[in-house]
Amino acid sequence: MKKINRKHKDSVFVDLFANDIYAKENFISLYNALHKTNLDPKTTEVKPVMLENVLYMSYYNDISMLVDGKIIVLIEHQSTVNQNMPFRFLEYISRIYEKITTEEDRFGKKLVKLPIPEFYVFYNGVENYPSESELKLSDAFLIPEEKHNLKNNDFKLEITAKIININVEKDNPILHQCEPLKQYSDFIKEVRDCMKENIENPFTTAINRSIKNGVLSEYLKRKSTEVHNMLFGEYDYETDIRVQRREAFEDGVEEG
């Protein structure tokens, strides 16, 4: 699987499932866990269709792959789940369709066949979020009072995002069906534990402990420096987000 070169930093999640030399095997393992299939990474074609400039900050946490007639879009969230994810996915998939089709396709009379989109958010933040849930684009629709009894299937446009909590404590079944995802979740827990201990070099310690415990050990031995730098970027990002939210809250309190 060809490595994606993008201008900003990728997260460890993206590197593990989209860029690393074993990313294809890891991604197929995750795909099989999501779909209860048994695709063989050696014979299954996987085509990256990731986009540039989808985030305003300094690193990427999105993966989009064309596989088995589907476009699988994965987002990792380490902070509060954004309730506007279906809207963001709508924008995202529109740009992907534009990317994989030609102008002639879009304006020609012949029907253009499009891969089926699927949207997943993998949550591993610290809030007590359900093991699995869904967000729908229709939840954001402005519905007149007299039509509040509309059902979801009454809407002409819908995007459904499946939210999967991959924190080890939630013990989501997918963690037992995809070993790379399970080890990634174990690693992130180790990172958080080291940060709570106020260790001078928490990322280095987390990497060393994980290698010792057999968690992503081959990957971490091979890419310890890169992983350290990715973690630094990710948690710097999370700090920035928390600061922005706190400042926005304080501004709101001051304004009354």
Where are these regions (language model features)?
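Elongated, amphipathic alpha-helical interaction scaffolds
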Residues: 1-255
